[in-house]
Swiss-Prot record:
Active site: D237
Binding positions (substrate): G83, H236, D237, T238, N296
EC top class, as a word: transferase
Cofactor(s) of this protein: Mg(2+)
Function: Involved in the catabolism of L-rhamnose (6-deoxy-L-mannose). Catalyzes the transfer of the gamma-phosphate group from ATP to the 1-hydroxyl group of L-rhamnulose to yield L-rhamnulose 1-phosphate.
Binding-site positions, ATP: A13, S14, S15, G16, R17, T259, Q304, G402
UniProt GO cellular component terms: cytosol
Transmembrane feature ranges: none
Protein known as: Rhamnulokinase
GO-annotated molecular function: ATP binding; glycerol kinase activity; rhamnulokinase activity
Length: 489
């Protein structure tokens, strides 16, 4: 038997993990083992919302050392993280300023300013990226306007996965899939857009040309002295998750479900027409020159905050209580900016219901019901938008990531969307990370080859839509009302 041992470092906005993958070439089987799992979260520092990158680096090194202590020879390492955030370095590679998180309020008002000064359509034609108030484009503008004293000291700007790869190898890299999330990469050249960079106030010299997944950045020297390749995987966690989505044919859509929900489809060409702009569709970079045509949805961040505020530890019990409640009594727009980082999520949800003359969710289960129903309805709207954009309906939706373990939300999604839902794999970002490593090691041919491995080894569960469910009837009433309004217009 020929084995490959690859390590994936997968950092999300709420947790991180170091996972060991063992790939057996002859039987094309892939097994994962969790080596180290650790918390991640927002911190308050000097008036900013920040990430504790030192703690994250220590956790990464601890996980890697654990693998080496077992006597396992690692063939390669890959790192993926969330998008848009960055670390600034001086000429000596030391940090400049704080690693500010995207949920910080420093970018307030800057997206509207950019649209006014540059033109919304021009920004979109250049980048193909959706307008989110925390995109790197606006973060850099906030930095250069609000902290000009830092500018003379900055030599490099590294996105989060590139920063941690640099800390392991001493080599700098700017990986393409994550770079596209910045709204600073030109969709035609795959390089930094000079006009957008100029508006941000950043110096182009801070960045190197983005590289596509699959190159070796450098080497990490393990405690035993071995030099282990660190591979530039699809370092945006959603890009990795999509690689591991067992998409079957052109009519398959995906939903990467976690702190954020990202719904979309793969395409060989981007969509930057007026319809895509009006729907705020993004065209993020994927592996093998594919585009991830998708839309960001606030996701389980709302639930995570409610769990924290209400000190709820038994999630299965909460879901069971939630399932017993009637559907669609409390509906909010999860994508409203008010939910990005409110002082109290529970109060913000209640206020949104109060302002729209709805009943007020008071209990833990009612708040969860509000979140799940609202997410499922938004999923249905977004899936409809995506189908209209490409001119073809979808036949199935693959839900991947940690959120796919929520069977209630999976069924609500199937019912609201009226589509077959296939849930799994759970550790999609980790698997996609491993997939690029195996391709770099010449163990697999391409993404489609890797997806065949995932399909045969991952635990997948199918949810069939129930047209008689409460949420399905609610969606039907909404569509009927919309059609009536359109006919009367």
């Amino acid at each position: 038997m020929t084995f490959r041992n690859c390590v994936a470092v997968d950092l999300g906005a709420s947790s991180g993990r170091v996972m060991l993958a063992r790939y057996e070439r002859e039987c094309r089987s892939l097994t994962l083992r969790e080596i180290h799992r650790f918390n991640n979260g927002l911190h308050s520092q000097n008036g900013y919302v920040t990430w504790d990158v030192d703690s994250l680096e220590s956790a990464i090194r601890l996980g890697l050392n654990k693998v080496c202590e077992e006597g396992i020879r690692i063939d390669s390492i890959g790192i993926d993280t969330w998008g848009v955030d960055f670390v600034l370095l001086d000429q000596q590679g030391q940090r400049v300023g704080l690693p500010v998180a995207y949920r910080d309020s420093r970018t307030n008002g800057l997206m509207a300013q950019a649209q006014q000064q540059l033109g919304k359509r021009d920004i979109y034609q250049r980048s193909g990226i959706q307008f989110l108030p925390f995109n790197t484009l606006y973060q850099l503008r906030a930095l250069t306007e609000q902290q000009p004293e830092l500018i003379p000291h900055i030599a490099h700007a590294l996105l989060m996965p590139d920063y941690f790869s640099y800390r392991l190898t001493g080599k700098m890299n700017w990986e393409y899939t994550n770079a596209t999330t910045t709204q600073l990469v030109n969709i035609n050249s795959d390089d930094w857009d000079e006009s957008l960079l100029a508006w941000s106030g950043a110096n182009k010299a801070w960045f190197g040309r983005p590289t596509h997944p699959g190159n070796v950045i450098g080497h990490w020297i393990c405690p035993q002295g071995n030099e282990i390749p660190v591979v530039a995987v699809a370092s945006h966690d959603t890009a990795s998750a999509v690689i591991a989505s067992p998409l079957n044919g052109s009519r398959a859509a995906y939903l990467s479900s976690g702190t954020w929900s990202l719904m979309g489809f793969e395409s060989q060409t981007p969509f930057t027409n007026d319809t895509a702009l009006a729907a705020n569709i993004t065209n993020e970079g994927g592996a093998e020159g594919r585009y991830r045509v998708l839309k960001n949805i606030m996701g389980l961040w709302l639930l995570q905050r409610v769990l924290q505020e209400r000190q709820i530890n038994d999630l299965p019990a909460l879901i069971s209580a939630t399932q017993a409640l009637p559907a669609c009594r409390f509906i909010i727009n999860p994508n409203d900016d008010r939910f990005i980082n409110p002082e109290t999520m529970c109060s913000e949800i209640q206020a949104a219901c109060r302002e729209t003359a709805q009943p007020i969710p008071e209990s833990d289960a009612e708040l969860a019901r509000c979140i799940f129903d609202s997410l499922a309805l938004l999923y249905a709207d977004v899936l409809h938008e995506l189908a209209q954009l490409r001119g073809e309906d979808f036949s199935q939706l693959h839900i991947v990531g940690g959120g796919c373990q929520n069977t209630l939300l999976n069924q609500l999604c199937a019912d609201a969307c009226g589509i077959r839902v296939i849930a799994g794999p759970v550790e999609a970002s980790t698997l996609g990370n491993i997939g690029i490593q195996l391709m770099t090691l010449d163990e697999l041919n391409n993404v489609d080859d890797f997806r065949q491995v995932v399909s045969t080894t991952a635990n997948l569960t199918t949810f069939t839509p129930n047209p008689d469910s409460e949420i399905a009837h609610y969606v039907a009433r909404i569509h009927s009302t919309r059609q009536t309004k359109e006919l009367c217009a």
